[in-house]
């Protein structure tokens, strides 16, 4: 599933092609995505100028004066800006045509993505109750320490809770905990403020670097220009169970934590 760096890579790739453009029309070939596409998307979006394209957590918002189209890539979704006469491929579910003859095409083989509508001045229910962005100043060791008090869940589960912090999925949680030297099994409420500061710093560093590398291509993610993400080539623990730890050489451990595959070094991470 695309995580924060992949979604941010998508946003940055789309922004120069969408900002300031006016929507000419919307074609919905399949409306039965993870949630049905509401009729407001096709009824209200045509004629509107795209003022901005923003990211909140793993959602992309195409802002107009009357509201925002809210997009989620799901497990396998992709967004591409293409010439208006580009032939259809399998799973091309939505076209948003623009005033310059080009179009924004949403392709989603597994149909776990979504396209929703948020009226101006409102916050869509899916965006309510979300934690801070991990790259914002509000996300630091003090914040994590305060939020973790009384929490008995493993720290990896805690870190992946979208109400705690958004956009830190399985890949980047594993890599951040490794860099911070914290076992993913450690009880969240028993980690010191100092160790949480190391973890917050690791999350910021790893996510920031992954964005510069275009995200991680494991199965389905391709950026808007068709390029894969290259951070996969630099993963230190994720997907490497049984292989030597890059720090100490001991075999990396594997377990299921919170129903997610987890890999770590039991020697370097305590």
Swiss-Prot record:
DNA binds at residues 91, 110, 151. The keyword Hydrolase applies. Coiled coil: none annotated. It catalyses: Hydrolysis of DNA containing ring-opened 7-methylguanine residues, releasing 2,6-diamino-4-hydroxy-5-(N-methyl)formamidopyrimidine; 2'-deoxyribonucleotide-(2'-deoxyribose 5'-phosphate)-2'-deoxyribonucleotide-DNA = a 3'-end 2'-deoxyribonucleotide-(2,3-dehydro-2,3-deoxyribose 5'-phosphate)-DNA + a 5'-end 5'-phospho-2'-deoxyribonucleoside-DNA + H(+). One of its GO terms (biological process) is base-excision repair. Binds 1 zinc ion per subunit. One of its GO terms (molecular function) is zinc ion binding. Keywords: DNA damage, DNA repair, DNA-binding, Glycosidase, Hydrolase, Lyase, Metal-binding, Multifunctional enzyme, Zinc, Zinc-finger. Its EC number is 3.2.2.23, 4.2.99.18. The active site is at 2 (schiff-base intermediate with dna), 3 (proton donor), 58 (proton donor), 260 (proton donor). InterPro entries: DNA_glyclase/AP_lyase_DNA-bd, DNA_glyclase_Znf_dom_DNA_BS, Formamido-pyr_DNA_Glyclase, FPG_cat, MutM-like_N-ter, Ribosomal_uS13-like_H2TH, Znf_DNA_glyclase/AP_lyase, Znf_FPG/IleRS. The keyword Cell wall biogenesis/degradation does not apply. Pfam families: Fapy_DNA_glyco, H2TH, zf-FPG_IleRS. A zinc finger (FPG-type) spans 236-270. Its cofactor is Zn(2+). Involved in base excision repair of DNA damaged by oxidation or by mutagenic agents. Acts as a DNA glycosylase that recognizes and removes damaged bases. Has a preference for oxidized purines, such as 7,8-dihydro-8-oxoguanine (8-oxoG). Has AP (apurinic/apyrimidinic) lyase activity and introduces nicks in the DNA strand. Cleaves the DNA backbone by beta-delta elimination to generate a single-strand break at the site of the removed base with both 3'- and 5'-phosphates. Monomer. Belongs to the FPG family. NCBIfam families: fpg (TIGR00577), PRK01103.1 (NF002211). This is Formamidopyrimidine-DNA glycosylase.
